[in-house]
Amino acid sequence: MEAAAQLLKLGHTPIIIEKGDRLGGHVARWHRLFPDLTPAGELIDRLTEACKEANIFLNTEVSLVNRLRNGYNIILSNGITISTKYILMTTGFKMFEASKKEEYGYGIYNNVVTNSDLENWFNGNKDERIDSSSMKAIGFVHCVGSRDEKAGNGQCSKVCCITAIKQAI
């Protein structure tokens, strides 16, 4: 969304193709952002407003991209074909399925949640797994699914540590 907003400032009309029913991806479900604890909703609202002149397709995915001599044809899941000279593709990310690491008890015990689950709960959404009345302390386990060859992901996600610090604040 930030890239689209900047392209609009430069006089271009970007096309945003969002597979979900609203803009913002994962951030739209989060509570506050690091380092200044800005409410995530404020950022999403600001970027949505900044992108209002873009062509936006919600609940849509890119089905096929064909390279042409002077550009691309993009076929969308809704049947629309777009011809363009340039593509800036931002694919987002998938959260690691924490239940794959059974040793941490996610999906087995209450009060064992991911950073994303906790953000969603902080944002006022109910989560039956979280019982704040029984909590005396909170521990954060870093790198679950990241830097883990057995889980198929040897890279660091670059967000777990900073998110845990923000949530601890």
PLM segments and residue spans:
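Rossmann-like dinucleotide/flavin-binding elements
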Residues: 1-24, 65, 91-169
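N-terminal glycine-rich dinucleotide-binding loop that anchors FAD/FMN and/or NAD(P) in oxidoreductases
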Residues: 28-59, 101-118, 162, 166-167
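A conserved short coil-to-beta-strand element within the FAD-binding core of flavoproteins
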Residues: 58-71
